[in-house]
């Protein structure tokens, strides 16, 4: 079982994928807020990539403002490349994506940019839904869990992590920016779910 200390080691360019409504934008905003407190607001930026959903850009701007960081919009890969070049002085750039294009996102490459790619899934996601993100042997730098609670049964997530080499990193319990992100280890996740199973038997 693998886990990764994403928050402690986070720098450079990080791109996030996941289904629509999974909570990508709020997770990214929390990451931005957390890291801005450590390295300074001027050193962090959020980029929205190819997300043309109604209200999506407004939400990015709102949450970026609450996190105290700048936000940018890239309509395609070429504009993303230009924006990332302009942001080369930033210590951390977080890239939000359209939930409808997660598999495209995994194969995305930007010349001269080392893009770390992360998958965000909901705690109640089914194993079949998770498998879709690995069906073409996609690899992700880490997996993040949204809508997490200690009472949630996350066996599908655990099974998916056991079958793939994707390390677990952090979890988000709710959309409130002031609720801190949680570092998660696979072993702790398994133990917690085993305890929940035992409690449910009584």
Predicted region positions:
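Primarily NTPase-proximal linker/entry elements flanking Walker-type ATP/GTP-binding cores
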Residues: 1-44, 48-52, 61-77, 81-85
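Conserved catalytic-core segment of NTP-binding enzymes
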Residues: 52, 66, 76-85, 92, ...
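Short, surface-exposed alpha-helical segments at coil->helix boundaries
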Residues: 57-58
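Expand to "…catalyze enediolate/carbanion chemistry for C-C bond making/breaking, isomerization
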Residues: 202
């Amino acid at each position: 079982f693998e886990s990764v200390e994403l928050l402690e080691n986070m720098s450079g360019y990080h791109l996030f994928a996941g289904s629509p409504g999974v909570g990508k934008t709020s997770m990214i905003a929390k990451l931005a807020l957390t890291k801005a407190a450590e390295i300074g607001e001027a050193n962090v930026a959020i980029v929205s990539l190819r997300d043309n959903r109604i209200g999506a850009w407004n939400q990015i701007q709102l949450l970026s403002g609450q996190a105290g960081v700048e936000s940018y919009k890239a309509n395609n890969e070429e504009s993303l490349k230009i924006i990332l070049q302009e942001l080369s002085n930033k210590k951390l750039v977080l890239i939000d994506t359209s939930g409808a294009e997660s598999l495209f996102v995994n194969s995305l490459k930007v010349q001269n940019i080392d893009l770390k790619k992360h998958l965000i899934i909901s705690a109640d996601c089914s194993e079949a839904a998770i498998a879709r993100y690995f069906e073409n042997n996609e690899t992700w730098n880490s997996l993040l869990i949204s809508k997490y609670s200690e009472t949630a049964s996350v066996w599908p997530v655990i099974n998916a992590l056991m079958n793939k080499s994707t390390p677990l990193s952090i979890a988000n319990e709710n959309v409130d920016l002031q609720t801190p992100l949680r570092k998660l280890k696979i072993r702790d996740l398994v133990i917690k779910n085993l305890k929940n199973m035992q409690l449910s038997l009584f």
